[in-house]
């Protein structure tokens, strides 16, 4: 029997309900998910777990996503991990700031899950992933 590698996604989000719902949706889509509640934990988790992709909220306590992304990009062990910024901020200025910090993509909350999964798969070079069933 052939083992299929499961892609690892780190989701960094300070709101517990949003973090839990998104983590569950990603797991139902076939990913292995780890979570962190702020930028400090996110940087530590990324270094320890070596995820295939990071979803990063931008507005968090202790260390915001902008700073966490800059740190991850400056560390050779995490510099090449794709990072998708997720924020309630919809302005072009915040999107530009996230991309300048080193994010590969920027999504505005509420996130369109099917579009997010397509984007994740593009970065992970996976043609398809299970879509969670709507309730």
Predicted regions and their residues:
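Charged docking surfaces used in two-component/phosphorelay signaling
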Residues: 20-28
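Conserved acidic carboxylate
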Residues: 13
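Active-site beta3 strand of CheY-like receiver
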Residues: 49-55
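Receiver (REC) domain active-site loop signature in two-component systems and cognate sites
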Residues: 60
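Short hydrophobic/Thr-rich beta-strand motif most characteristic of the beta2 strand and flanking loop
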Residues: 30-37, 45
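C-terminal output helix
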Residues: 111-120
